[in-house]
């Protein structure tokens, strides 16, 4: 569907996800259209949430979005990096998640969503990866899999 003319009129790159925010108008009167998950998450957090209103939280959220969409995704999806970088990154990420606190601020937000989206891929795409050394990551994945939005997106409800 994303390569059909109707979608390409919204996003000429034909990529998912894409967000059309009709509450914000561009100078030409068209609704704001954003693609790339990190940009969408940042827009939603800045526009519709109080979790990144400070410069510190905005900077930290941006850091986690960049980490998820570059460092973590490369370590996960590029085989040579998966062997070299993945264990080290997972060890530190497990330590970060062990606090059971949001990555930024006091409520679950864009940073958590970005990281947890990639972690949720692990059991689906890489069932051979042993997550036993990363108990906090395992727990995080289990919690993600129980979220109503995740269950709906995966067709479980």
Report the location of each language-model feature.
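Exported/periplasmic ABC-transporter solute-binding proteins
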Residues: 140, 156-157
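Phosphate-coordinating loops and pocket residues in cytosolic domains that bind phosphorylated ligands
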Residues: 9, 146, 155
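GST-like fold's C-terminal all-alpha helical module
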Residues: 56, 64-151
